[in-house]
């Protein structure tokens, strides 16, 4: 182990920055904080993505809060997922505490309590700016991925989208999509078959069942209008600070499909909308995905490939993705390899499997002459973390056990009245919280089917009337025998014979 002076020099050189940066805290050696050995993250590398990991109660959420605050202060907007409901306090300044002052004195940083510009958003019926997307915007590829469809079923989904494009039928919500799917094998079977080929009823039945499963997780709340414009995520307030957009997800932890659907839709829309930026001095937007395992658990291979592709490509748009989870093994290796910043809080070894995971995690970090990484991972205290980042030239910085700085904002939830204040001040609620139900595929096809049914009924009535008329004509037209038997001549003749007999 090296001495303090060597360690300080090692950190000072490894974290020397020419451009703008965020200070995370100060390096630690043998459990002691080395004052002014500041651990800095260059802003220009923030679009290289990152990981914040650690056991429950080790300080992951506070680290997320620190990063979000400092990015906002630098004029960079942030989007973060609040699955536990404890991030809304960012809107209010920290009340302060002697322990915070003591921590910052050790780090060598002044502590300045402050609140930040916040926009509260929601995927469900919770209060906040409603986030929605139309099925058309989601597109056939993403919809097939999220439904985990076979190649044949993917083809049917593509045909449904093509039919709607060709016939100018807006696909706004899941009801629209289901209606077209039912129409394809019902009333519109001939129309579809002549234009796109035969569509299997069993395949459409499977797709319908998977859509119903998605609806049961609340996706019907997400699909629809008014569709959210991602440009509204990159707003700056009047003081030049980036808005921190907090999506309240406390009620969807048990609905991972909805979470995955939203995340993929959002990332795809951002990638399609934001201009190419390349390597610039600062990112355009940073996203923090809390409880990241919800995206990766039970995800199909196709879905994981989609996520990996987006992670690779989206950084060129100036977007940084930060996954927050308990264990780095929650994130697939191919995604983990794309992450430039790693903030690892303490891991707990209760089982042989845990110890194996810690050894694997230690191998993800640069070798350090000052630390036994596996040992440090289990001995870190709350609010301490191992940090490995990229310097301004994209090279790994020295591994540093770090005493993390405290958040400047409140480390607790907002009260109901404080949330109401934030919502009342929002400019986006007025824009997005009005539900629109314009004419779409469901209504147009329903009308088309109704019209066809009325015409069929009319034709049926005409045929029935025609039959009745024919029947009446037949009944009034005399049978020749009857005609003879009932004729006056025949009757008179018979009566004449009878008279003769009587005589």
Question: Which role fits each region the language model picked out?
Answer:
Residues 1-16, 28, 130-136, 376-478, ...:
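Conserved P-loop NTPase motor module
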């Amino acid at each position: 182990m090296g001495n303090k002076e060597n360690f300080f020099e090692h950190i000072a050189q490894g974290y020397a920055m020419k451009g703008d940066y965020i200070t995370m805290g100060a390096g630690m050696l043998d459990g002691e904080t080395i004052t002014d050995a500041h651990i800095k993250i260059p802003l220009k590398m923030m679009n290289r993505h990152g990981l914040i990991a650690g056991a429950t109660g080790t300080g992951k959420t506070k680290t997320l809060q620190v990063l979000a605050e400092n990015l906002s202060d630098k004029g960079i907007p942030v989007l973060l997922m609040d699955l536990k409901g404890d991030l809304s306090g960012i809107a209010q300044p920290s009340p302060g505490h002697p322990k915070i002052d003591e921590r910052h004195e050790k780090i060598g940083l002044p502590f300045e309590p402050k609140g930040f510009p916040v926009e509260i958003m929601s995927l469900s019926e919770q209060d906040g700016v409603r986030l929605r997307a139309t099925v058309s915007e989601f597109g056939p590829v993403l919809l097939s991925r999220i439904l985990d469809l076979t190649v044949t079923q993917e083809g049917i989904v593509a045909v449904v989208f093509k039919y709607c494009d060709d016939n100018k039928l807006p696909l706004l919500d899941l009801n629209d999509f289901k209606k077209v799917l039912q129409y394809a094998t019902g009333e519109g079977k001939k129309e579809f078959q002549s234009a796109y080929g035969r569509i299997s009823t069993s395949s459409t039945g499977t797709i319908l069942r998977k859509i119903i499963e998605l609806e049961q997780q609340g996706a019907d709340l997400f699909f629809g209008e008014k569709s959210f414009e991602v440009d509204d995520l990159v707003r700056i307030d009047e003081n030049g600070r980036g808005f921190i957009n907090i999506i309240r997800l406390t009620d969807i932890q048990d609905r991972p499909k909805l979470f995955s659907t939203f995340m993929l839709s959002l990332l795809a829309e951002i990638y399609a909308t934001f201009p190419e930026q390349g390597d610039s001095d600062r990112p355009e937007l940073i996203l923090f995905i809390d409880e990241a395992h919800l995206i990766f658990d039970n995800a199909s291979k196709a879905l994981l490939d989609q996520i990996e592709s987006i992670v690779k490509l989206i950084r060129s748009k100036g977007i940084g993705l930060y996954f927050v989870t308990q264990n780095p093994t929650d994130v697939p290796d191919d995604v983990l390899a794309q992450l430039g910043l790693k903030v690892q809080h303490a891991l707990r070894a209760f089982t042989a499997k845990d110890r194996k995971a810690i050894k694997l995690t230690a191998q993800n970090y640069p070798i350090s002459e000052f630390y036994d990484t596996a040992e440090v991972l289990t001995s870190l205290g709350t609010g301490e973390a191992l940090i490995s980042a990229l310097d301004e030239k994209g090279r790994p910085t020295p591994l540093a056990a770090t005493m993390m700085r405290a958040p400047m904002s409140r480390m607790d939830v907002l009260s109901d009245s404080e949330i109401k204040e934030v919502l009342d001040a929002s400019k986006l609620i007025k824009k997005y919280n009005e539900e629109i139900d314009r004419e779409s595929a469901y209504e147009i096809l329903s009308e088309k089917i109704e019209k066809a049914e009325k015409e069929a009924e009319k034709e049926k009535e005409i045929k029935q009337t025609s039959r009745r008329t024919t029947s009446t004509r037949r009944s009034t037209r005399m049978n020749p025998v009857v005609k003879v038997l009932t004729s006056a001549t025949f009757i008179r003749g018979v009566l004449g014979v009878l008279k003769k007999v009587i005589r």
